[in-house]
Amino acid sequence: MQVLPPSSTGGPSRLFIMRPVATTLLMVAILLAGIIGYRALPVSALPEVDYPTIQVVTLYPGASPDVMTSAVTAPLERQFGQMSGLKQMSSQSSGGASVITLQFQLTLPLDVAEQEVQAAINAATNLLPSDLPNPPVYSKVNPADPPIMTLAVTSTAMPMTQVEDMVETRVAQKISQISGVGLVTLSGGQRPAVRVKLNAQAIAALGLTSETVRTAITGANVNSAKGSLDGPSRAVTLSANDQMQSAEEYRQLIIAYQNGAPIRLGDVATVEQGAENSWLGAWANKEQAIVMNVQRQPGANIISTADSIRQMLPQLTESLPKSVEVTVLSDRTTNIRASVDDTQCELMMAIALVVMIIYLFLRNIPATIIPGVAVPLSLIGTFAVMVFLDFSINNLTLMALTIATGFVVDDAIVVIENISRYIEKGEKPLAAALKGAGEIGFTIISLTFSLIAVLIPLLFMGDIVGRLFREFAITLAVAILISAVVSLTLTPMMCARMLSQESLRKQNRFSRASEKMFDRIIAAYGRGLAKVLNHPWLTLSVALSTLLLSVLLWVFIPKGFFPVQDNGIIQGTLQAPQSSSFANMAQRQRQVADVILQDPAVQSLTSFVGVDGTNPSLNSARLQINLKPLDERDDRVQKVIARLQTAVDKVPGVDLFLQPTQDLTIDTQVSRTQYQFTLQATSLDALSTWVPQLMEKLQQLPQLSDVSSDWQDKGLVAYVNVDRDSASRLGISMADVDNALYNAFGQRLISTIYTQANQYRVVLEHNTENTPGLAALGTIRLTSSDGGVVPLSSIAKIEQRFAPLSINHLDQFPVTTISFNVPDNYSLGDAVQAIMDTEKTLNLPVDITTQFQGCTLAFQSALGSTVWLIVAAVVAMYIVLGILYESFIHPITILSTLPTAGVGALLALMIAGSELDVIAIIGIILLIGIVKKNAIMMIDFALAAEREQGMSPRDAIYQACLLRFRPILMTTLAALLGALPLMLSTGVGAELRRPLGIGMVGGLVVSQVLTLFTTPVIYLLFDRLALWTKSRFACHEEEA
């Protein structure tokens, strides 16, 4: 029977050691809570970091970019500019479309922003054109955020107009109702309509004008209230045949009488069922299709939203005819799931490697089982807390848990090693557990809180990066806290019940061989340490040189923002000459599609031509290239992009810009490339002067590639210069001229056909098949005040001019965006510096301001705060350690280990060819928390030896280094192996995880080698400094 130690031993662990059943059940409760939490947690690619973003779209068919800017965009912008919480407002006014994107502060709820936007639209309504076909429509979606799912709807038996009608009424509306869906857009522009194509010669011969026809149609098709009759006994509702709903009915419409004979619409026009906008088209691979893009609301869970869509699709497709086929072309969640699965596999691999290293050191199965239980328990228990904090299972939280594997095992190792040491000395297991746990308790607390102190600055990081790493930091901190609890409760209890002198002494051939190897290593370390202690100044110079080297490496290492991920989807923009027509652009798009689909890595392609609010002009096309799964293709996305661009370069007259889609989207506009730089001025003239000059210089920089600008000011314009005096003499107003032109060439929506399920438009235009180009203007006729018909050419001259194809604003001022990529042999930091240097050489006028946008702006912000972030982490750790040790000196000794970690991490990143990006910086901050553990374990035991055994500082630190060498080596290798799977990851999302692993492995290797020697020397140096300081104070007191 064991004699129980005094109740004073064991510290906080005593209660749990003495009550094994209660401790076991408590741990089971943590385990069950974690399992339940894991099942309840949503899955996503990254933590929720979206800015509240709302897009406002206004369509005004036929309006020029200048008219859209002045008549639609500007009135709306003035109202939006008064909203509180607005961070940035950008707009794009192109032919027939105005798109305004409103980005709000992160702290503003999206519902509040929505209310403000609706109020602003209402306030601007009276200032908008009276003939606007539809009011502005807003959606809670970021236009730069790629769709979560893309579907193609095709049919071999039905026209596309019928297909779109069915998709819009039966499919799109239902998907829009799913929680998390922000916007469902149909690309292809085949909305059904009745198209009236006037024969200009026929109406001229009859003395009619297009305005006569328009008035007749609008008056003949109405759908308004007619009232009801209320008699003594019956009530009767009034109805009439006031609506015409088919092309045949419109053909029979009488528009005028001449000589008593009716003139019907079919006599002067071709009336047919067609598409509302004939200048829109979409293709799935090579087949014309209706392409449905589903975008999520900011803040919505992408996985659950996509799952809901897939669950509904079978039901929706059953409601369509069998000749209509619905195909899922892309689903972003496929790669997100694969990335999360790969990270989970790496987490399990890290746990296995850590357990293996424990067995290698302890060489005892019972002693290995204890941390083998503590590690997964600490990690699983973290899931329960994540649920309460509304976190998700994503790449960053799983990376935090993977890294935590090496952290949480440290506590268990330290406890087991200390208890085992007393058992090997002959103590009973229970007494050894109480004594060892009590002795090591303060060390565990020091390790835990000093490590959490490193994470505190991450929680105070501002803007998007702070939001991004909030879940990472808190998840890691929670895992570390749970680990500390488990190490002070379950671990000593299990040691007391599972360890014994017999089990620890039981050895096999492997145990004996490894024991001899460790003894030789420790002996060699002891001899080396003795020599180092005899030459302290040489060692100190090595420590100082690592500090200098870390600063130099920090300055010269290439810097980036966020790793470019391979998500299997490429966004593309196809650019043709500015005067390209829709037909010409559609032909070029088909040529490019043929080339792209021949690439072995491409699975499918969707493409779109036309102006719809997202695509700004007819001379550009949007592409989405869906690649095969990563395990089915030989190359990653960047190589595929380079290969596709080389192939498309052979197609004449087009430029192709490609970029891989990313899980982290900071931009608010669809861009041609990954990075953006803007020039903002007070006038378009200033931009037209300086944009070409800057573009010329930027295109010569080797640090940039794919440099392009959205400044397109060579769009052809037929300027109708009206002789106002002549027009006035004939009684013709400018409104009459505009109406005539709009009727002829604007695809004017002149009337609405109402049905039980939907509403369709009547479109008026001239039939220009026989009079293409500018010749069509010669067919325009106007009505004079005396009823005569006047040719437009008699009162106006037609001049050809150039004008912008689109007008862009940023915070209500004209802006041009320059897009660029960064070549493989340069970093984003190099590109940013090169652009800034080039800008200085131009001496831009004061009325032109420049700014980086999107992730480039976030990179500048993150780079500026990085140094302060690291300083804050060091200061936070110093404060915590100073409080724990009640000393100003010992924390400095502990923190002296940090430069070695920085040198190792930066060297490893440079050797691996990785940039110092946000992920790598987080790894360096974590290293600050890891490497100081070595110093803490040494200093704790040295101080105890000085205090309890009366040893000299040199003997105490020497003994502490030898006693703690094995747990120091064990914990460092455990942390290293925990990060190793991240460094070696090759699956989906590996680009995101690898920099963290590389930095941590490199930092741990270098710091492990150096701190074992530098820490004791610095400890003794500061001890002498403390003695000298005390003696100086004592002398001053005696003199006083």
From Swiss-Prot:
Compartment list: Cell inner membrane
GO cellular component, one term: plasma membrane
Presence of keyword Transport: yes
Topological type in the membrane: Multi-pass membrane protein
UniProt key word Iron-sulfur: no
Pfam family, one: ACR_tran
Annotated transmembrane regions: 16-36, 347-367, 369-389, 396-416, 440-460, 472-492, 537-557, 863-883, 888-908, 911-931, 968-988, 998-1018
SUPFAM superfamilies noted in UniProt: Multidrug efflux transporter AcrB pore domain, PN1, PN2, PC1 and PC2 subdomains, Multidrug efflux transporter AcrB TolC docking domain, DN and DC subdomains, Multidrug efflux transporter AcrB transmembrane domain
Coiled coil segments of this chain: none
Gene Ontology MF terms: xenobiotic transmembrane transporter activity
Alphabetic keyword roster: Cell inner membrane, Cell membrane, Membrane, Transmembrane, Transmembrane helix, Transport
Oligomer status and interactors: Part of a tripartite efflux system composed of MdtA, MdtB and MdtC. MdtB forms a heteromultimer with MdtC.
Homology family: Belongs to the resistance-nodulation-cell division (RND) (TC 2.A.6) family. MdtB subfamily.
HAMAP family assigned to the protein according to its UniProt record, in alphabetical order: MdtB
Name recorded for this polypeptide: Multidrug resistance protein MdtB
